[in-house]
Structures are given as structure tokens and as C-alpha cells.
A protein has these predicted regions:
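Internal alpha-helical scaffold of NAD(P)-dependent oxidoreductase catalytic cores
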Residues: 2-23, 27-120, 143-149
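Conserved short loop/turn motifs at secondary-structure junctions
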Residues: 84, 98-100, 128-129, 156-160
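Aromatic-acidic/polar surface patches that form glycan- and anion
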Residues: 85-89, 133, 161
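Short beta-strands and strand-loop turn motifs
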Residues: 93, 124, 151-155
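Conserved hydrophobic/aromatic pocket- or pore-lining residues that grip, position, or stack substrates
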Residues: 96, 132, 140
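A short structural micro-motif
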Residues: 116-121, 160-164
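Conserved phosphate/anionic-ligand binding catalytic regions in large, soluble enzymes, centered on
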Residues: 122-136
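ATP-dependent carboxylate/acyl-activation modules
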Residues: 136-137, 141-167
Length: 167
């Protein structure tokens, strides 16, 4: 089996001698504030020992620290939901932008007003950027359906963001 494209090896695969670690990419190219040295690194391994050594290696070079995930599936799922959450938030603001336009309200004016509350997340309407933000939700959709659940919200957000160019 796999999650996010990475085969999962365990004792049932007769790969007891295979050791590998996993640490999802978390950088944002071009972002001058959030550099690799200031982003906590999620680490994992296919065994507890490998996980320890992967975490030890990254903790020696990442100043912000590390988070040693329980296993590779947890680390992979964390990466997928980071991007899926961003996709969902962009879909929300894109849909609100369509609604506000029909109501003759400037979306950016609304966002500027809403930003005055400390816990508002100021997403801007537009296309989803990055090479994985628009793709990772489909991995989660696939694994959800494989597990017997239809993730309607994920389908809706992808539909909204895929059609934003029409508006």
C-alpha cells in the first residue's frame, strides 16, 4: 500500500533489512521570512531506530527544531493536510469573492476589514499556486475513497479552485 505515492514497507513486505527515513518538504520558494532553517522539520522512519537517526540528523542542521512523527504515514498525512488546508482556504475566499462580486462588494476591502481580528487568516482570491497544493488534495481524496469515505468538501474545494479562471 502507499500514501501520497510512497510505498509503505513493513514487516509484512519482508523488507526487514531495508531502512529508510522520510521528511516532507516544507519550504516555500521565494519566501524570505520562512527559510529552511526557521521551519520545524517533520521527520520519520520505517523503524523506531531509523526514525531516531533521521530526527537526529535533521536536528543537527535545522535551527527551528524537529518533530519526530510517530511513523511515515503520519508524516506523509501531515504534509498532505498542510497543502489541503491551504487549498480549502483559497477555495473559501474564491467562492466568497464570487458572492461579493454579485453583491457589488469589494473582496479586498472585506479582507482588510476582517484582518483586524487577530485570528482571521487573510487569504486572497485567485489561482492556487505551487506545484503540490492543487495536487495533494487528490491524494487525500483517493485514500479517503479507498477507505470507504467520500470527501465532498475536498471535491468542492478542488472544483471551485479549478474553475476560478472562469471568473
Amino acid at each position: 500500500s502507499s500514501f501520497a505515492g510512497l510505498p509503505i514497507y513493513d514487516d509484512t513486505n519482508n523488507c526487514r533489512s531495508l531502512a529508510f527515513g522520510y521528511s516532507p518538504e516544507r519550504i516555500n520558494p521565494g519566501d524570505k521570512e520562512h527559510k529552511i532553517s526557521s521551519i520545524i522539520k517533520v521527520t520519520s522512519g520505517n523503524t523506531e531506530n531509523v526514525s531516531y537517526w533521521v530526527d537526529y540528523l535533521y536536528s543537527s542542521i535545522i535551527k527551528a527544531g524537529t518533530h519526530n512523527a510517530k511513523n511515515i504515514k503520519v508524516a506523509e498525512a501531515a504534509k498532505v493536510i498542510e497543502n489541503t488546508q491551504r487549498d480549502l482556504n483559497i477555495a473559501l475566499i474564491n467562492e466568497l469573492s464570487i458572492v461579493f462580486k454579485k453583491m457589488n462588494i469589494d473582496t479586498l476591502d472585506v479582507i482588510n476589514a476582517a484582518e483586524t481580528k487577530w485570528n482571521f487568516l487573510p487569504f486572497k482570491p485567485g489561482l492556487v499556486g505551487g506545484h503540490c497544493i492543487g495536487v495533494d488534495p487528490y491524494y487525500l481524496v483517493h485514500k479517503s475513497e479507498e477507505s470507504g469515505y467520500i470527501p465532498n468538501l475536498l471535491y468542492s474545494s478542488r472544483s471551485i479552485n479549478n474553475s476560478v479562471a472562469d471568473f
